[in-house]
Regions:
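Beta1/beta-strand and adjacent pyrophosphate-binding region of the FAD-binding site
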Residues: 6-20, 358-372
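Second-shell loop/turn segments in exported
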Residues: 15, 55, 73-78, 131, ...
Length: 772
C-alpha cells in the first residue's frame, strides 16, 4: 500500500469503537462529563450485543443499576429490537455524541511517541480519520487494541463455546450442540407467538482468523435452520480465550460490579487505551457474566466516567500519522480506494498514511463482493462450475433487498431461466400446505430464500463470509487482482483471478479507478427510497418515503435515525436502505433510454430483462422531458451486453445489478430482481469459464456462454445470431422526422443521433412552406 493522505472528519477527546450497549453507556457517560465523543459502530444498528446476539433476556440477579439499563429493559417482557436500537440512538443524540453506522475501524493514528492519536474508519464512503486523545475499544475481540500493537495472550487453537439464538423452530440435536434451551418468553408479534431457542455449541476454532470464525458460523447455521425459523442471531456470542495484557490482571470474583478494577481493562503497554469487552484481563467465567448487557452497561458507564476524568487535561496530539507495521511483504500490486472528504463542512485536514502492507486473508478463483440479488446467484453459479469461490457479504444473510430489504415480491422482470429454478426451489423447501406458503405468484418468504441461497452456495463448494465490507481494490496496472476488505478483525486483501463487484453501486470498480455516473455533478435527480419496518415472518414491506445516497455513510446513518422515529411502535426495521438508484460504472458501453425503447440487440448479450420504466421520481432524459411514457405499466424487453458489466479500462473485474453501465433513466427497466438473479448466474458462469480457460472476460468466447444461457432459458435463442446495431439509416431518420410532429412519434429514433437529426431536420425545415 503506497503512501497516501486520509481525510480527517472530526477531532474529539474520545473515540469509542463498537456499537454494543456497553459502548453507548461509556460514550454517554464520558460525554456527560464534558468530553467530546465519537462512536463508531460496524453494524447498521446499535446494540449489537443485545440485538445482534439476541440477548434480550435478563438473567436472575441482574439488577438494573443505571438509568440507561432501566430505559432498555422497562418491564418483565423482552424489549423489541426497535426499542433497543432507538433508545440507544436517542442516548447518543441527546448527549451530543457523534456516531456513524456501518463503519469499521481499520487503522489507528499515533503521535510521534507511539501513543494513540485517533482511528481510521472504512465505510461505503471510503476511509476517513478521526483524531482523539484516547480510545475505548468496545469491539468483541479487541481488534483496535491489536492495531495499536498492544500486548495480548497468545492464541491457543481448540474447542470454543458459542451461543446462537433462533426464533420459531423446534430445538435441534447435533453432536456439537451441548445445550438447547427454550427461553422463558416467546417472541410475540400481534397474535403470533414464536418460541426462542438458545443453543450452546462446542466447535473447534482453528486459528484467530476471521475465516475460521466465518466457517464456525456457517456450521452453526447448518445445524439449526428449518422452515419454521423466522429469525436468528446476526452475531455469534462467545467469550474469547485470548485476553489483553492489562495494567493489572484481575483473578477474583467481585462482590459488586463497582469493585472491578479498571486496571484489568487498560492496556499494559499502550497509554490511553482501554478495552470494554470480553478480552479484558479477567477470568473467562467472570467475563461471561459481566459482558452480558445489564452488567456491561454498568461497567461501560463506570469506564466512560473514569476515562473522561483521566484524559481531561491531556491535549489532542498535535501530530498524528497512520500506524503502519514494518513487515516483509510480497508485492501483489497497489491498493486503490476512495479518500474523499465526507463533507466540506466536516473537513479537518488530512493525516499521512505511510507506505505499508496488508495481510492476505485468502486466495480464490472467483471472489464475489456482495451477496445480494445478483451476487448470491453469481457465487452459486461460479461454485457449481467448479471455481474456488468466496462470497463476501456485509449483512448476515444472502439476497440483499429481495430478502433482508423486505422486497420479497416481484414487480416486473423476466422470470424464466435460473430465476424459475430459484422460485420453484425456494417454495419447495416447505410442503404446499405449510402456513407460511405465500398466496400468489412471485412471493417468497425472506428467510427461506436467504437459506436457499446459503445452502446452495455451500453445497456447491463455495465459501461464505458474513460481516465483511469491501473498501478497496488490489490493482496492478489495469488488472484487478483482488479486493480490500474490512472485517470485525481488521483490514486485509483477498486475492482473486476474477472479481465480481456485486455491491450494487460498483464500489470496488470505482476504488480500482473506474469512472462512474451518479446524482450530483449533472443533476440532483435521484429515485425515491425507503427504510421499512420488519417483524418475524415478514417478507414484503416496500415503501418510498425518502431520498438517500446509500454510498454516503452520513446520509445512510441519517436515514436509519429518521426511520426509527417514523416506525416507532413497530417490532424492528430493515438493516439495509431500500434504494433504487446508486452509482453506475462507466463500462465499455452505456445503455441508453433509446436502446431500451428501440429494442437494441447486441452480439454479446449476457442478460435479458423485461420491465416498465419504474422510475420512482424525477426523470432527466430529453426524450422523457418531451414525451413521458404514456402508460404507467408498459413492459419493454431489453438486452444487456457483457460490455455494460465491464468497467472501462479495467481487467479481471465485472460489475452487476444497479452498478452496471447504464443511463439512470434506463436503469429502471434493467434492475428488476428476476432479471438480476439471471444476470448474476450468467456472470458467475462466465467468470468460472474465464478461470478454466485462463482468459479475461473480454477474451472469452461469448457465444459459448450464450449457448449455455439459452439452454437453461436465461436468454432467447435469437441472441446467438444477433448482430451489432450500426445506427438508423437516413431513410429511417427522415421517416421519423416526418412523424415527430404527431405527438413526438419517432423521437426515440431521432435522439439516437442528435447531429444527423439536426442536419436532416434543418433541411426539411428549410424546404418547408408556410400554409396560406
Amino acid at each position: 500500500e503506497g503512501a497516501r493522505k486520509i481525510p480527517v472528519i472530526a477531532e474529539v477527546d474520545l473515540v469509542v469503537a463498537g456499537g454494543s450497549s456497553r459502548a453507548i453507556a461509556a460514550a454517554v457517560a464520558a460525554a456527560k462529563t464534558g468530553s467530546r465523543v465519537y462512536l463508531v459502530g460496524y453494524m447498521p444498528y446499535l446494540g449489537e450485543d443485545i440485538c445482534g446476539s439476541h440477548l434480550y433476556e435478563r438473567e436472575a440477579g441482574e439488577k438494573l443499576q443505571t438509568a440507561l439499563a432501566r430505559k432498555l429493559f422497562p418491564g418483565k417482557n423482552f424489549p423489541t429490537p426497535l426499542h433497543i436500537k432507538k433508545t440507544l440512538e436517542d442516548e447518543l443524540i441527546d448527549n451530543n455524541v457523534q456516531f456513524l453506522y456501518s463503519s469499521y475501524v481499520t487503522n489507528v493514528l499515533t503521535d510521534p511517541s507511539g501513543k494513540p492519536a485517533g482511528v481510521v474508519i472504512a465505510n461505503r464512503s471510503g476511509r476517513q480519520a478521526i483524531r482523539c486523545k484516547a480510545i475505548i475499544d468496545a469491539t468483541h475481540n479487541a481488534s483496535v487494541t491489536g492495531l495499536l500493537g498492544a500486548e495480548r495472550k497468545p492464541f491457543i487453537a481448540g474447542s470454543q463455546e458459542f451461543c446462537y439464538t433462533v426464533v420459531g423452530n423446534t430445538p435441534k440435536e447435533a453432536p456439537e450442540i451441548i445445550q438447547a434451551e427454550e427461553l422463558s418468553q416467546p417472541i410475540k408479534v400481534g397474535e403470533k407467538s414464536y418460541p426462542v431457542t438458545r443453543y450452546t455449541f462446542h466447535l473447534p476454532l482453528k486459528d484467530d482468523s476471521y475465516a475460521s470464525l466465518a466457517e464456525v458460523e456457517q456450521i452453526i447455521r447448518n445445524r439449526t435452520w428449518d422452515i419454521d425459523q423466522v429469525d436468528s442471531s446476526d452475531l455469534l456470542w462467545y467469550i474469547p480465550k485470548q485476553t489483553i495484557n492489562s495494567e493489572k490482571a484481575y483473578n477474583g470474583n467481585p462482590v459488586s460490579w463497582r469493585k472491578l478494577p479498571m486496571q484489568a481493562f487498560k492496556s499494559k503497554n499502550i497509554a490511553n487505551l482501554w478495552v470494554l469487552g470480553p478480552c479484558a484481563e479477567i477470568p473467562r467465567e467472570l467475563a461471561a457474566k459481566v459482558m452480558r448487557p445489564v452488567p456491561a452497561l454498568f461497567i461501560g458507564e463506570m469506564m466512560g466516567e473514569t476515562v473522561a476524568r483521566q484524559i481531561k487535561d491531556i491535549p489532542v496530539p498535535a501530530q498524528a500519522t497512520v500506524r503502519q507495521l514494518k513487515v516483509n511483504a510480497s508485492n501483489y500490486g497497489q491498493t486503490g480506494e476512495l479518500l474523499s472528504p465526507l463533507r466540506p463542512s466536516l473537513q479537518k485536514g488530512f493525516v499521512d498514511s505511510p507506505a505499508g502492507a496488508l495481510p492476505v486473508l485468502g486466495s480464490y478463483d472467483v471472489v464475489v463482493m456482495g451477496g445480494g440479488t445478483a451476487g448470491a446467484s453469481a457465487g452459486i453459479s461460479a461454485a457449481k462450475q467448479g471455481a474456488n469461490t468466496l462470497v463476501l457479504e456485509y449483512l448476515h444473510g444472502l439476497g440483499g433487498l429481495s430478502t433482508l430489504g423486505m422486497i420479497g415480491v416481484y414487480w416486473d422482470g423476466f422470470r424464466g431461466g435460473y430465476t424459475a429454478h430459484i422460485d420453484k426451489s425456494v417454495l419447495a423447501m416447505a410442503p404446499k400446505d405449510h402456513p407460511r406458503q405465500p398466496k400468489g405468484e412471485g412471493r417468497f418468504p425472506a428467510d427461506w430464500k436467504m437459506e436457499w441461497h446459503r445452502k446452495e452456495l455451500l453445497q456447491a463448494g463455495g465459501k461464505l463470509w458474513f460481516g465483511v465490507m469491501g473498501c478497496g481494490a488490489l490493482i496492478e496496472g489495469s488488472q484487478v487482482k483482488g479486493v480490500v476488505v474490512a472485517t470485525p478483525f481488521g483490514r486485509g486483501v483477498i486475492l482473486s483471478k476474477i472479481l465480481i463487484d456485486s455491491t450494487g453501486s460498483a464500489d470496488i470498480a470505482i476504488a480500482a479507478g473506474a469512472a462512474f455516473d451518479y446524482t450530483g455533478k449533472k443533476t440532483i435527480a435521484v429515485q425515491g427510497a425507503g427504510t421499512g419496518k420488519w417483524a418475524p415472518g415478514d417478507y414484503y414491506n416496500n415503501n418510498d418515503w425518502l431520498f438517500v445516497d446509500d454510498t454516503d455513510i452520513l446520509d445512510v446513518s441519517r436515514a436509519f435515525v429518521q426511520a426509527k422515529t417514523k416506525l416507532q411502535g413497530q417490532y424492528d426495521l430493515v438493516k439495509i436502505p431500500q434504494t433504487r438508484e446508486r452509482r453506475r460504472v462507466i463500462g465499455d458501453y452505456i445503455i441508453s433510454v433509446y436502446d431500451v425503447i428501440n429494442h437494441r440487440r447486441y452480439p454479446d448479450t449476457i442478460s435479458y430483462h423485461k420491465s416498465s420504466f419504474d422510475t420512482h421520481g424525477m426523470i432527466i432524459d430529453p426524450l422523457f422531458i418531451l414525451n413521458p411514457p404514456e402508460k404507467r405499466h408498459k413492459i419493454y424487453d431489453a438486452d444487456v451486453p457483457l460490455r455494460c458489466l465491464l468497467p472501462k479500462g479495467l481487467e479481471g473485474i465485472l460489475t452487476t445489478g444497479l452498478g452496471a453501465s447504464a443511463h439512470r433513466d434506463a436503469m429502471p427497466v434493467i434492475r428488476m430482481q428476476p432479471c438480476l438473479q439471471n444476470q448474476g448466474y450468467a456472470v458467475g458462469y462466465l467468470s468460472a469459464l474465464c478461470v478454466k480457460e485462463n482468459k479475461s472476460p473480454r477474451k472469452i468466447d461469448i457465444k459459448k456462454v450464450q449457448r449455455h444461457l439459452v439452454k437453461i432459458g436465461n436468454l432467447p435463442e435469437r441472441v446467438l445470431t444477433d448482430k451489432e446495431f450500426k445506427g438508423f439509416s437516413n431513410s429511417e431518420m427522415k421517416k421519423a422526422i416526418a412523424s415527430v410532429t404527431d405527438n413526438y412519434k419517432g423521437l426515440e429514433i431521432l435522439l439516437t443521433d442528435p447531429e444527423r437529426c439536426i442536419q436532416l431536420a434543418s433541411k426539411q425545415i428549410a424546404g418547408a412552406t408556410m400554409p396560406e
